[in-house]
């Protein structure tokens, strides 16, 4: 488990570190730029999750196929089916982003400069560079399903360093280059995805046991698409619901002003370091659950998942204590605006509630999906997103006047109730009848 988890954790940590550096670099350029990029990052993340749906479907099916020792032909058909679906989806989303961004931004109450920056970033990164992002995510998911998490970590580090260098050139005008601002930052992010896409392909070619050939891609059997979609479509529903609910919450937060948006962005940037362990263990749990279920070793994986969750929760809670002890200098890295500083400081205290629930949620949902039990966590997740997170945040944050604290309480209630329900689902062992390999 450690062999899988550690590279994933390092990859996640480095990715979050670079994202934080991006935020700091943008904050030195303009607070309006931070608010703009933070706003459309909800949509950018939506694209990531949408493409990850196919990657997740391929990863879960491949993990169970590998555990069941399926043939190379069957393994390759799954990867090819994912490629076809990702290509079609990326073309559609590119057109949607380019022609629909103005309509999306009109749904928000934004200062003119914030709106301009948001449009520039999303059209370039979310639209023009969409194709590279899609295939990078798919290839990464396939490589990890074979257990090559170290290679995925190396690709992530190189791609993120490319992103940082591109940002520096765009914002600071090194070597006499013009300061490109937000468009340059978006282009740098797109370039990093291109680098990632190329490197993943190189690693897949080098690993002879990773079966992913494009030859004969037009002859993929329908069953391969069905297997991927059986897992991917329900996951898409959950992902769509979660991200639309996040966008809805951001729209409500935007009515509180630019300072509130900036505080939300900075707080989430800090929290990503907190849940890096939980999300890494959750991803590794999904892979391991797939292997064990495919090999029909249900009793072993049933017990192991509880220990995985205990480690994840402990890591998250220790990190929350550490972050709150050193939060003043940490927040000072991002902002010196008193109002924003105060917002972030308060939110970090309430974030312990969110992270406790998130640590449960990430592990048990990962285990259930790896076992093939996708529909239940999806349906309950949709219910919880809109009942506890959106409605709860609206009532507490807007109606009761608690502001950002009310939103944080709503989000925490969603994460915690979902985590407890998923724990009970795992204990019931109903997931055993949902294995993809019979």
Regions found by a protein language model. Give the residues of each.
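Helix-terminus/linker motif at the lipid-water interface of multi-pass membrane proteins
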Residues: 13, 17-35, 105-112, 169-180, ...
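Transmembrane helical elements of multi-pass membrane transporters/channels
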Residues: 3-22, 159, 192-196, 200, ...
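Transmembrane alpha-helix boundary and packing residues in multipass membrane permease domains
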Residues: 8, 12, 23-24, 60, ...
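Small-residue-rich hydrophobic transmembrane alpha-helices
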Residues: 23, 34-95, 133-152, 250, ...
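Short runs within selected transmembrane alpha-helices of multi-pass transporters and secretion channels
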Residues: 55, 125-144, 152-163, 185-200, ...
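N-terminal transmembrane alpha-helices
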Residues: 1-24, 28-29, 45-57, 87-94, ...
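Transmembrane alpha-helix boundary/anchor motif
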Residues: 21, 57, 95, 99-103, ...
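Short alpha-helical transmembrane segments in multi-pass integral membrane proteins
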Residues: 1-8, 62-129, 177-233, 289-354, ...
């Amino acid at each position: 488990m450690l062999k899988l988890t550690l590279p994933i954790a390092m990859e996640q940590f480095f990715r979050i570190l670079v994202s934080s550096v991006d935020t700091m670099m943008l904050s030195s350029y303009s607070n309006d730029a931070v608010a703009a990029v933070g706003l459309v990052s909800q949509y950018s993340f939506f694209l990531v999750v949408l493409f990850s749906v196919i990657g997740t479907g391929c990863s879960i099916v491949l993990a169970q196929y590998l555990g069941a020792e399926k043939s190379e032909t069957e393994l390759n058909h799954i990867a090819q089916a994912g490629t076809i679906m990702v290509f079609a989806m990326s073309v559609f989303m590119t057109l949607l982003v380019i022609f629909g961004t103005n309509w999306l931004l009109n749904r928000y109450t934004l200062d003119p400069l914030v709106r301009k920056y948001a449009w520039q970033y999303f059209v370039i990164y979310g639209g023009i560079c969409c194709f590279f992002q899609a295939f990078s995510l798919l290839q990464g998911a396939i490589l990890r399903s074979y257990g090559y998490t170290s290679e995925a970590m190396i690709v992530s580090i190189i791609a993120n360093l490319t992103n940082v260098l591109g940002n520096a050139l765009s914002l600071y005008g090194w070597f006499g280059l013009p300061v490109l601002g937000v468009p340059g930052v978006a282009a740098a992010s797109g370039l990093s995805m291109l680098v990632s896409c190329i490197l993943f392909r190189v690693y897949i070619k080098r690993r002879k046991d990773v079966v992913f050939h494009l030859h004969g891609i037009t002859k993929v059997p329908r069953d391969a698409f069905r297997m991927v979609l059986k897992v991917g479509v329900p996951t898409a529903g959950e992902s769509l619901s979660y991200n639309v609910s996040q966008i809805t919450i951001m729209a409500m937060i935007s009515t509180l002003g630019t300072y509130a948006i900036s505080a939300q962005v900075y707080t989430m940037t800090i929290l990503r370091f907190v849940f890096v362990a939980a999300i890494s263990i959750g991803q590794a749990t999904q892979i391991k659950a797939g292997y064990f279920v495919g090999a029909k070793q249900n009793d072993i994986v049933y017990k192991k998942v509880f220990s995985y969750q205990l480690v994840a929760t402990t890591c998250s809670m220790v990190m929350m204590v550490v972050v709150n002890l050193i939060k003043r200098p940490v927040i000072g890295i991002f902002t010196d605006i008193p109002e924003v500083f105060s917002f972030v400081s308060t939110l970090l205290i309430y974030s312990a509630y969110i992270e406790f629930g998130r640590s449960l949620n990430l592990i048990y949902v990962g285990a259930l999906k790896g076992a093939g039990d996708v529909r239940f966590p999806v349906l309950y997740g949709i219910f919880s997103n809109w009942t506890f997170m959106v409605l709860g945040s609206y009532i507490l944050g807007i109606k009761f006047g608690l502001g950002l604290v009310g939103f944080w309480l709503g989000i925490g209630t969603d994460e915690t109730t979902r985590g407890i329900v998923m724990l009970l689902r795992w204990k019931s062992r109903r997931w055993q009848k949902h294995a993809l390999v019979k």
